[in-house]
């Protein structure tokens, strides 16, 4: 029997992922737990929580929220379609001489983008070039919007 800490951590983690309609695979639940446990203990605790936690198609979710499985699968399929374009846009941004790194963030980064998703990026700019990087990213966004894609440079650091 557990002291309740692990069970509480499992429920809190699943409740958080539920906000995003994102049931978790066992490995994801293990990774996102705020406490470190052995995978075997996690599986045991899930067995004890069978009235509060459901499991289907290798996904864990809060009981009564089984519909989010379909949502996750739809969003994963949609994200797969967008990923190639997002990588292409990221390569264009990364080719600018004052951009040191481009990282995809947001819902697309975790393959959970809905139909109206934009492309969220984190940019690492050369020293003293944050505003230049932002200006070019916003200018490039004006271009990509012609093709129905919105770029959002959510975080720009130097």
Give residue spans per PLM region.
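Residues in well-ordered beta-strands of folded domains
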Residues: 61, 122, 154-158
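Conserved catalytic core of two-metal-ion nucleotidyltransferases
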Residues: 137-158
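Catalytic micro-motifs at enzyme active sites that drive phosphoryl/nucleotidyl and oxygen chemistry
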Residues: 89-91, 104-112, 140-144
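A structural signal for short, well-ordered beta-strand segments and their strand-loop junctions
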Residues: 101-104, 154-156
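Short, hydrophobic/amphipathic alpha-helical patches that form generic packing surfaces
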Residues: 12-16, 135-141
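Helical scaffold of the NTase/Pol beta-like nucleotidyltransferase catalytic core
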Residues: 1-102
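Catalytic metal-binding acidic patch
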Residues: 106, 110-131
């Amino acid at each position: 029997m557990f002291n309740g800490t692990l069970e509480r951590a499992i429920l809190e983690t699943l409740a958080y992922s539920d906000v995003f309609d994102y049931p978790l695979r066992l490995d994801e639940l293990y990774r996102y737990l705020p406490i470190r446990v052995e995978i075997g203990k996690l599986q045991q605790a899930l067995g004890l929580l069978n009235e509060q936690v459901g499991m289907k198609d290798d996904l864990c979710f809060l009981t009564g929220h089984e519909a989010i499985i379909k949502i996750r699968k739809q969003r994963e399929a949609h994200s797969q379609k967008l990923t190639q374009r997002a990588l292409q846009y990221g390569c264009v941004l990364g080719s600018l001489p004052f951009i040191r790194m481009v990282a995809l963030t947001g819902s697309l980064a975790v393959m959970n983008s809905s139909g109206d998703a934009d492309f969220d990026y984190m940019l690492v700019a050369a020293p003293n070039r944050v505003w230049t990087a932002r200006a070019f990213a916003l200018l490039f966004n004006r271009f990509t919007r012609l093709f129905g894609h919105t770029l959002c440079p959510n975080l720009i650091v130097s």
